[in-house]
């Protein structure tokens, strides 16, 4: 587990990251989405000890000051392959030595090459003899040979063709299954990420939301106009802001629903009426239900068993409700 509290990072007088509380389960495959320039790469570099000193803000596996061995449990793979000007085998050996690995060297090399469908004849090649695709695969294979506890992958599919992207996905799943390896994958390639994610994170305005950006809305007059206007100005979280926030995010895992014809009289914090199901998508153990509410689109999540029990259909009308703990205000 990596635990983060009160992490703030500025670059050229601009606030890039402001993460109050976040826990990263290092045994899971987590994905980090966000627009270009949102700070995804910076966040990964911080986690790999390459930016600033955040020893008071980040705990790694229970340690605020991890030793070198513990630091090597984290491996960062950059978007573009970085290979030394020596043979591929020498690149493997250098990395394994750097990570203090002295046993099973040949086994690790062969296994990582096999994962990525790479021929052992490439071990004698130098970087200038490799195609860009081969270089990308070799860099990933070298990373996998370390068998780190937690991998940080920065835009791993950025320069890949469709077949190689699929191969990378299968390899990530194999590593996770065989070695209980965790991954934090930063990308804006939704197709690459969707089938991998056990946990979704979204970086927006320096803050990390534990869901994607479908449910982020602009605030107008301290609220949002769905079918009915929802005023959020009385929320404690809203009042905590010195400057009025400009956006609101609603956690899809904390939204519930009921049939619009049978609205109970319970005291819910917020109710959205006349929501119509427009799309259904299945991911791992959850089903995401996308609804249209006037001109707004939002999603909520159900476990697959729950979804089957309720037998929800496209174009069905629902009312949604949620409490203040489901919302997050953003600048």
UniProtKB/Swiss-Prot annotation:
Keywords: ATP-binding, Nucleotide-binding, Translocase, Transport
UniProt: ATP binding residues: 34-41
Domain ABC transporter per the UniProt entry, residue ranges: 2-230
Coiled coil: none
Function recorded in the entry: Part of an ABC transporter complex involved in ultra-high affinity tungstate uptake. Probably responsible for energy coupling to the transport system.
GO molecular function: ABC-type tungstate transporter activity; ATP binding; ATP hydrolysis activity
Species whose genome carries this gene: Campylobacter jejuni subsp. jejuni serotype O:2 (strain ATCC 700819 / NCTC 11168)
GO cellular component, one term: membrane
Similarity comment: Belongs to the ABC transporter superfamily.
Pfam annotation, one family: ABC_tran
Catalytic activity: tungstate(in) + ATP + H2O = tungstate(out) + ADP + phosphate + H(+)
EC number(s) given by UniProt: 7.3.2.6
Subunit (UniProt): The complex is composed of two ATP-binding proteins (TupC), two transmembrane proteins (TupB) and a solute-binding protein (TupA).
Name of the protein in its database record: Tungstate uptake system ATP-binding protein TupC
């Amino acid at each position: 587990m990596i635990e983060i509290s009160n992490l703030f990072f500025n670059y050229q007088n601009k606030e890039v990251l402001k993460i109050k509380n976040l826990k990263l389960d290092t045994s899971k495959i987590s994905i980090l989405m966000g627009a270009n320039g949102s700070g995804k790469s910076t966040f990964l570099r911080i986690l790999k000890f390459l930016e600033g000193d955040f020893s008071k803000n980040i705990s790694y596996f229970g340690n605020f000051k991890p030793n070198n061995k513990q630091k090597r449990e984290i491996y960062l793979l950059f978007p573009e392959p970085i290979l030394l000007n020596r043979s591929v085998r020498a690149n493997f050996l250098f990395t394994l030595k750097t990570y203090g690995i002295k046993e099973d060297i040949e086994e690790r090399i062969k296994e990582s090459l096999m994962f990525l469908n790479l021929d052992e004849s490439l071990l004698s090649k130098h970087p200038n003899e490799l195609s860009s695709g081969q270089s990308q695969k070799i860099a990933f294979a070298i990373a996998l040979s370390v068998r780190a506890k937690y991998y940080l992958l920065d835009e791993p599919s950025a320069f890949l063709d469709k077949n190689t992207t699929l191969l990378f996905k299968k390899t990530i799943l194999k590593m996770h299954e065989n070695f209980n390896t965790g991954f934090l994958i930063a990308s804006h390639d939704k197709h690459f990420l969707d089938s991998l994610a056990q946990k979704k994170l979204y970086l927006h305005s320096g803050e990390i939301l534990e869901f994607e950006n479908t449910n982020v809305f602009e605030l107008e007059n301290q609220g949002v106009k769905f079918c009915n206007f929802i005023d959020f100005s009385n929320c404690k979280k809203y009042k905590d802001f010195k400057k009025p926030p400009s956006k609101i995010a609603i956690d899809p895992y904390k939204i519930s629903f009921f049939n619009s014809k049978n609205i109970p009289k319970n005291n819910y914090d917020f109710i959205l009426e006349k929501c119509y199901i427009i799309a259904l998508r299945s991911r791992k153990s959850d089903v995401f239900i996308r609804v249209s509410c006037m001109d707004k689109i939002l999603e909520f999540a159900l476990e697959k068993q729950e979804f089957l029990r309720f037998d929800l259909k496209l174009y069905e009308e629902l009312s949604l409700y949620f409490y203040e703990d489901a919302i997050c205000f953003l600048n």
